[in-house]
């Protein structure tokens, strides 16, 4: 459960991310594909080369969804219901992949905003990403 401090921390750091959804999203996906190559199986039709238009577009979608989640931080299930159903029923993404992506999101935020990612903010953002992952996997049950 996210505390009020966690929510404030997430909103504060995300305000710095919000202007870079495509760039950071693409970077997070590229990191995930490199660090966890098994995740590539969900994207057989993508050009997975650095900076590809498909990675940039999908990265923007991923970070736009996270942006929406931040904007609805008090109702993550409502904000992410459609995506949860899509990933569980249509795409059948293995739930562990959400944790892989969350790790890469944290790394990207740390690289671009090192001064903002204090230990407390890091913990809050990690809790938020875990909550998002939990909601996205809720339809698997």
From Swiss-Prot:
Expression across tissues: Red blood cells.
Keyword Transmembrane in annotation: no
A GO CC annotation given for this chain: blood microparticle
UniProt GO BP: hydrogen peroxide catabolic process
Keywords on record: Heme, Iron, Metal-binding, Oxygen transport, Transport
Binding of heme b, residues: 87
Parts forming coiled coils: none
GO molecular function terms listed in the Swiss-Prot or TrEMBL record: haptoglobin binding; heme binding; iron ion binding; organic acid binding; oxygen binding; oxygen carrier activity; peroxidase activity
InterPro entries for the chain: Globin (IPR000971), Globin-like_sf (IPR009050), Globin/Proto (IPR012292), Hemoglobin_a-typ (IPR002338), Hemoglobin_oxygen_transport (IPR050056), Hemoglobin_pi (IPR002339)
UniProt-annotated binding residues for O2: 58
Residue span, Globin domain: 1-141
A family per Pfam: Globin
Its job: Involved in oxygen transport from the lung to the various peripheral tissues.
Quaternary structure and partners: Heterotetramer of two alpha chains and two beta chains.
Family to which this protein belongs: Belongs to the globin family.
Protein's UniProt name: Hemoglobin subunit alpha
Native source organism of the sequence: Crocodylus niloticus (Nile crocodile)
